[in-house]
């Protein structure tokens, strides 16, 4: 009996050692994405209040469409991990190629949607200058969507192959390039025209293509991908049944992401009439909560890969070990973040604003945000585990019911 307990503990420790190195680079990638948004806000703010508001408004309309498309592609990683678990390595390149085709198809659908949505700003604001700038921002960033989705497809190949560091390196390069490119396009440096806030969209679009090119080169010249390299870059017509299979599994993930991001957009609109103090306090709490959320989100993605791999091998003990290790890691993260935010809530708010009214209001909201971390961490991890089992339909129903039938009315 003691020997079995020791064996289970050993297996859990081994699984934890595989889970953490898989999750850490994903965390860096997620933080680099958040960092790019912060750089956009800072540079646009230097250009003017109108530019900063236009970037915020444009991104709030662009992001739901982009996140839905990216969510559909997120299933590629678990599918590839499952294939590797079944020792179907020969089909990995074939599936990646279909992922790239799906990325192209999603781009052809999403870009016209973004183009049409550029015209909604006139309905929600009387500020003509801000609306024009927000529309120009969306038009600029729209052209980078195909590269962004292609990057996600190739990133999913690496994640499904237990290689998350390449995306980390590319994400950090994108973050570093975002600063000079923003200044070049926003302020019209080195011969480029001055675009104002719309320049943030142009800079992001350029970075998407750079990231896609870097990820493609890292995949193509990686010796581990050599056996199926020619399948990845094949221009052979995709098989409709494979595309349908990926869409059937991926669309529920995209819908669940859409439900979540749309709720937070709606919450911001509901808070607007309550005054700038409430809006600013909510923004601070949401920003801190969003940063902390990247921790369990990264573990959830790593868990989906490990669960899919063990499930593909029909390894029940390995699957159980991956799930248990993931929950232990996430619960540890929850306790640490709850304690840190609760103890240092006022110091955290002071990093954003020194107004006593905002400090007192936001400090209370931070305690609620810290308490919210526990169910939210468990939720995002459970979604990752279900994704590893390729059970995505239940994710959509649970997310829609929780966020819109319970959360929004409350």
Segments from the language model and where they lie:
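Membrane-interface helix-loop junctions in multi-pass transport and translocation proteins
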Residues: 165, 175-213, 360, 393, ...
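Small-residue hotspots at the loop-to-helix junctions and early N-terminal turns
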Residues: 49-60, 134, 138, 201, ...
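Small-residue-rich hydrophobic transmembrane alpha-helices
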Residues: 52-111, 115, 148-167, 268, ...
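Short alpha-helical transmembrane segments in multi-pass integral membrane proteins
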Residues: 1-23, 80-146, 192-251, 307-372
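Transmembrane helical elements of multi-pass membrane transporters/channels
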Residues: 21-40, 140, 144, 174, ...
